[in-house]
Every structure is written in C-alpha cells, then in structure tokens.
Amino acid sequence: MAESPSAVDVRAQQCAEVTLRPATVDDIPALRALGEAVVPPTYGPIDAAYAQRMLDEWWTAERFADTLPRVRMLVAERDGQVVAMSSFGRLSASHRDFPHVTGDREVMWKLYVHPDHHGLGIGSRLLAEVESMTEGDELWLEVVDGNVRAYDFYVSRGFREVERVTDREWPDDIWLRKPLGGAR
Ligand SMILES: CC(C)(COP(=O)(O)OP(=O)(O)OC[C@H]1O[C@@H](n2cnc3c(N)ncnc32)[C@H](O)[C@@H]1OP(=O)(O)O)[C@@H](O)C(=O)NCCC(=O)NCCS
C-alpha cells in the first residue's frame, strides 16, 4: 500500500502549485478582494478603525492604479486565483512623508497572504523573491505594533528591529531591517 504523504510533503506540494508573477492593472479587483479578506483579521484586533482606514487608503482601485507604475508589485496565484501579493521599492518614490528618515531606503511596503492560504510557504517565497529583486544591500519594512505574527515571521527570516515611529492617533510603526547580499 502506498504511504500517505506527510504534512511537510503536502505543504511543499501546495506551495509548488503557486506561481509568482508581476502584478498588472488587470489584477486590481483581485488585489482589492485580497485586502478585504486579509486586512480586517490582521488589524481589526489591534484597532478596528485603523483596519478600516488601511482598506480605505491603501487598498482601493484608485490607489493601486496610482502605485502600479511606480512600485514593483508581485502576485502569487494558485489555481488561477490571486492568493497573495507583495509590493516594494524606494522610499523616495512613495507619496508618504517619513520625517524620521535621512537618505533613502529599499522598502517592502506590503506582504499579504489570503488567510485561507497561510502557512503554506507562500509568504516566505514572496519575501525571498523580493529580496532577490531588491537593488541595494538592505531591505526595510514596517510592522504595525501588535501584529505579533508578522513581527515574529520577519525576525525568524533575518529582520531586526531598528526604530519605532509613534503616532498619537494610530498604532506605532516598527521599522525592521535585513542585510542582503553576503549577510543574507
Ligand atoms: C505573515 C504572513 C505574510 C506569512 O505568510 P505565510 O504564507 O503564512 O508564511 P509561510 O507559510 O511562508 O511561513 C509561515 C510562518 O509564519 C508563521 N505563521 C504565521 N501565521 C500562520 C498561520 N496562519 N498558519 C501557519 N503558520 C503561520 C509560522 O509560524 C511559520 O513560521 P516558520 O516557517 O518559521 O515555522 C501571513 O501570515 C500574512 O499575510 N499575515 C497577515 C498580513 C500581515 O500581517 N502581513 C504583514 C504586514 S507587515
């Protein structure tokens, strides 16, 4: 009788069924739907108003149409469905203000996996791809204070906390950095 595959084999096979590719304008409705699926469970327990603000500001069709030409964006597809995405690029190309930063930074702005597809290695694959496509010797990212799962995920993959940006109204942003290249 054939042996049943282990959980590790199943996970590896499920991850192998996932393809990564650059996002296009045709993906915008799927990106919005991904945001609706992943943003509320991620940030709602931290601050429900903040979760809604994120969706309204950063996950709209207009915002994606504006950022796609300026930011590098990857999607992960499984069975023809967009199940995850990541965006990254230079801090100076962003529309946001970062008064605490001098100089420029390579930043991964987003890494989001649909909750039905967590734990299959998709986030790790996207992160590795972003690291390999990043020009420069370090990669930065922000984690919202209280997003412990994401924080632990990044620390286990070589990121270290550098600074915290406080905001009276909203949760703090914690900036993490990972050396790339030889120290990867
Ligand atoms: C953090 C996140 C990107 C990780 O993606 P993923 O595809 O689930 O990650 P992987 O399968 O590659 O790796 C899973 C790792 O994350 C941990 N993990 C986090 N959430 C998990 C879940 N729901 N199920 C299983 N593992 C989970 C595991 O401990 C595992 O770590 P290990 O491999 O060191 O044991 C994903 O959980 C996510 O999209 N979270 C919500 C959005 C978010 O917080 N994004 C980051 C914004 S800064």
PLM feature spans:
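A broad helix-preferring feature
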Residues: 18, 83-89, 140, 159
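C-terminal "cap" of GNAT-fold acetyltransferases
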Residues: 3, 100-106, 137-152, 156-184
